[in-house]
Amino acid sequence: MIPLTRRRALGSLGSLLAASPLLEGQELIGEPAGRITPRAELVNLFEVEAVAKRKLSGAVYSTIAGGDRRAFDRMTFRPRMLVDVQKLDLTTQLFGETLFAPILAGPMSDQQRFHPEGELATARGSAAANTVMIVSSRSSQPIEKIAAQAKTSLWYQVYPEPDIEAVRKRIQQAVQAGCKAVCLTVGAPQPQPRMKTDWSAIDQLRKGTAIPFLLKGIMSPEEAHAAVRNGIQGIVVSSHGDLHTNGLAAPIEMLPSIADAVGGNASLLIDGSFRRGTDVLKALALGARAVLIGRPVLWGLAAYGAEGVQTVLGMLQSELARSMGLSGRPNIKAIDRSLVKIHVR
């Protein structure tokens, strides 16, 4: 892995913002004939989604369409004006590693549905954006091939299986491939019987894993507190896209109470309908250390391949930097809960 320095990271981001490639769109299922918007003309992630929609069949696009943003709309900023923001610093520390920005490519399965190269392109795009990619155990490419494409850190996400030894073996393969952290998903819909995900089983996996161990799918302060008691090092506040439970709170709504329950004793991450840099800033203010980006990464992948992934992540990095400057927060440590006001429904 190439060592991350601030100069290298800023240089990479600057190259991204200055780039203006004119891409000739490959016509895929569902794409009408005509001009595909060049990446340099894109203004926000919703425009990337529009290109992806043109390139995918209706059935495939429906799996990554939309997102519930109502919770974000109920939050507003309380900026500080008399602050020097000439030098913005997005870097953050997570599990002993310095990240250029607190924005990661989240785990998503079977990415060849969206682009012929699938996770290989996502790995290259994430590396070009100087960020971590979290690889799903349900990837369409072997973890070893994905790792060969990655120039920045990989994490690994795994689902419970009936055979706990099979889960342990998957984790060992990921560690051997160079993954820096492992994330066990709990509470997601499963097509088959799954292992008994009580604390005893989780503890068996955690104690046999030499890299940081996270739980993804925690949505209550009580379970977050229990996770800390049981030695979990990181928690991803997530409703798995709210695909299986009507009436479930948005992850961003649960974040403040979960942050209070954890009390800084585990690293909090979050996903769930993040589409703008301001969304990321709100999550950081409410207690998250980093944000996982899911569907928009797949929009970029479907629209432009690896370059589209880089565009999506780089766009969010740039928007976060701009929002930090406008809010009077020159670095990540300066972001706290006083920045955000949550309005009653």
Question: What is the predicted role of each segment?
Answer:
Residues 1-17:
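N-terminal secretory signal peptides and thylakoid transit peptides that target proteins
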Residues 29-99, 194-197, 333-337, 341-345:
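An N-cap/entry alpha-helix motif that binds or orients negatively charged groups
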Residues 100-136:
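Glycine-rich active-site/cofactor-binding loop and its immediate structural neighborhood
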Residues 103-106, 133-135, 154-158, 182, ...:
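Hydrophobic faces of well-ordered beta-strands that scaffold small-molecule active sites
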Residues 107-115, 157-164, 212-217:
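Active-site mouth loops of central-metabolism enzymes
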Residues 128-149, 153-166:
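A gly/proline- and charged-residue-enriched helix-loop-helix capping module
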Residues 165-270, 281, 286-288, 295:
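Alpha/beta enzyme core
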Residues 251-257, 302-320:
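C-terminal helical cap(s) of enzyme catalytic domains, especially alpha/beta-barrels
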